[in-house]
């Protein structure tokens, strides 16, 4: 129904500002829902060529890059963002370019761009914290580890790019391969956490629980415990078992950033039991 409405708008007023936005909305449906990347790409490009709104121009540019990534065409995505950034000096485009370099398996280039960004932005900039977190992430899992570990991290990035291409089964297979061939203890918890999330999406809950159990003693211990509780609560319908996991956060991980949200969630569960 939505598709027919947008198509009629495009037919009746092809050069109007309304048509520009309608094309963008239709492209969103093709990209996010229908997953027809070729049609979405054509619509985003058409909308971009008509738009006068800076906001809509930016949205189209970022989406065109996303669609190229979804198609696995990193080169086109990077070239397009590079040329767009030379015309539109917009931070969001540069940040998207950093993302594309990272997921195309070029963390060194992404890190160089991040470090260059810190030369021109101040701590109050709205992107400062995000860039800082990304820099720390790359430093921890790539810069500070050996050559073998660096290759493992690049394979992890490839699995992330597969997810962005909607290839969830292939991403899971790649992560499983990494686990079976990886001896780097630093990156192992990251791989297990990411694979557990994918296994939940694939409704393989027992396998996900097995992955989450390996996170004990790692920097992701609290997340593993919480996610295990969520599996029992949301998918197995076992709130009593879920409470056991949630109480471990309260008792053993009181300093966790998740402790207060878990306290609040526990109160909700107990209130629901009273009803």
Where in this protein do the model-derived segments appear?
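Acidic, polar-rich low-complexity tracts and alpha-helical solenoid repeat scaffolds
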Residues: 1-275
